Amino acid sequence: CIRDRVATVRKHLPDMYRYVALRKRILGVDELHYYDVYAPLTKGVSAHYTYDQAKQMVLDAVAPLGEEYGTIVRKGFAERWIDVFPNKGKSGGAYSGGSYDSNPYIMCNFTGTLDSVSTIAHEMGHSMHSWFSRHTQPAQYADYTLFVAEVASTVNENLLIEHLLAEKNQDCLLYTSPSPRDCS
């Protein structure tokens, strides 16, 4: 229900205001613009992950969603549903798409950052949503709205963050972008 959504947003507004105030203070700005959300808050801290490490991080993160979910994510990795690396002429960004009679496919530009790992988790959430919709519903009901689509993708992202917080030294996690970076 829309009233529940609005109530939930209102309930969490103080947290958002606190985050904005903190980010403004750290960045030394009076007004926070959209691009400021992506500005790093620390200097000289970075981590690099291989694609194999990224796949394992995503698989570990989505484990709470059950064996079937994990098996299909593994299948997606094994069957190369993902066009992973940047190439000349390849567009930027990341997308998940496909048709009712095909597997979902992901286009991304993995660079080894934690943000790239988070992007794979996010896009795999879209792909899993599509896979389950297409395998459990007739074609006329298998599509979904953008609002609904973002639920599955952000759940995967949040599971990744929760997994990192549980597995890593919390002092080592720094929020340098919308996603945490670990200093392994």
Q: Whereabouts are the PLM-identified features?
A:
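Post-HExxH zinc-binding segment in Zn-dependent metallohydrolases
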Residues: 144-171
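Catalytic glutamate of the conserved HExxH
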Residues: 119, 123, 127
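Single conserved hydrophobic/aromatic residue that forms the stacking wall/gate
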Residues: 1-2, 175-183
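Short pre-active-site segment immediately N-terminal to the catalytic Zn-binding motif
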Residues: 107-120
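A sensor for short, sequence-defined functional sites
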Residues: 65-69, 135, 172
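Post-HEXXH active-site segment of zinc metalloproteases
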Residues: 130-151
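Contiguous, non-catalytic segments that form substrate-binding/exosite surfaces or channel walls
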Residues: 3-105
